[in-house]
A protein has these predicted regions:
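Catalytic subdomain that performs nucleotidyl-dependent activation
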Residues: 92, 101, 126-209, 214-220
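C-terminal-of-GTPase-core extension/linker across diverse P-loop GTPases
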Residues: 219-227
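Short cysteine-rich clusters marking metal-coordination/redox-active sites
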Residues: 240-244, 253-256
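Short, flexible, mixed-charge glycine/proline-rich loop motifs
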Residues: 226-237, 243-248
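Histidine kinase transmitter module recognition
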Residues: 28-31, 206-210, 244
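Residue-level detector of flexible, active-site-proximal loop/helix-junction positions
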Residues: 46, 75-77, 151, 191, ...
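Short Cys/His-rich micro-motifs in 6-15 aa windows
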Residues: 256-264
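ATP-dependent adenylation/nucleotidyltransferase module used to activate substrates
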Residues: 1-146, 166-180, 253
Length: 264
């Protein structure tokens, strides 16, 4: 997952998961003098929400004596998320969908700018299984394999991503953060009420309560599915976006496609 000379961009949001991840990687990195941990965050531009989360992220970085690197939607795409939501013409495409596409692009951009070898994200077990089930329910099971590409098989133009907390439950992450009194922002995003993920989360929480071990068992099934997909002769062909030159499976990458739809 990591090498002893890695330059690691740690994606933090100010929330509990990424705060715990940064703290753990910082402790580990102290034993590897040739490696470097660089906290990075994306400012989506959500009025009344992101500024408070950024305060928590800055507080943690000061505590760990690390410099936080920030990249905003506004500077990269010309719009904040609030402005994107106001300009969207298709209400069926939720704010979280826009945010997901643009956050992934922004994280890749800032990691490339910092010449990072890898991006570490704070996805925990609950997050991962919610995503797995959402992809299955949407009829896009192939995305499970595409979003969990082994580091040594990353597509050129994409900084490899790792999920060190993928087997740790949200409950345990919270316990770690509270035990060490780590600063984090725990107010939900104002756009979260639009998220399809909420229904999936509620279902999985109920299943884990009734059938303990459901989440970890589903992770193992997901890993088996990923292995099967990757043994298939079918390959995902990437070209370059005609507009921004980013890796893309089609003429226009999803980020540019969405920017065109809102009038950019």
């Amino acid at each position: 997952m990591l090498y002893d000379k890695d330059r690691i961009a740690v994606a933090i949001s100010g929330g509990k998961d990424s705060s715990v991840l940064l703290h753990i990687l910082h402790q580990i990195e102290n034993g590897y003098p040739d490696s470097e941990v660089i906290p990075v965050t994306i400012d989506e531009g959500i009025q009344g929400y992101r500024n408070k989360a950024l305060e928590s992220a800055h507080e943690l970085c000061r505590f760990l004596d690390l410099k936080l690197e920030v990249l905003s939607f506004k500077s990269l795409f010309g719009y904040s998320l609030d402005e994107i939501v106001q300009r969207r013409t298709d209400d069926s495409f939720g704010a979280c969908s826009y945010c997901g596409v643009f956050r992934r692009r922004a994280l890749n951009t800032i990691a490339q700018n910092l010449e990072a070898d890898v991006i570490a994200t704070g996805h925990n077990l609950d997050d991962e299984i919610q995503t797995v089930l959402m992809n299955i329910l949407r009829g896009d099971s192939g995305r499970i394999a595409r979003t969990n590409v082994p580091r040594d098989e990353a597509v050129e133009g994409f900084v490899p991503r790792i999920k060190p907390l993928i087997e740790i439950t949200e409950r345990d992450v919270v316990a770690y953060a509270h035990f060490l009194e780590l600063p984090y922002h725990d107010v939900p995003c104002p756009y979260a009420e639009e998220a399809y993920r909420n229904d999936v989360r509620a279902f999985l929480n109920d299943m884990e309560y009734r059938r303990p071990g459901t989440l970890l068992a589903t992770l193992r099934s997901s890993e088996a599915m990923t292995k099967a997909f990757r043994q298939s002769p079918t390959k995902w062909e990437f070209t370059r976006c005609e507009k921004c030159n980013a890796p893309s499976p089609s003429k226009l990458c999803k980020a540019c496609e969405l920017l065109e739809s809102i009038g950019s």
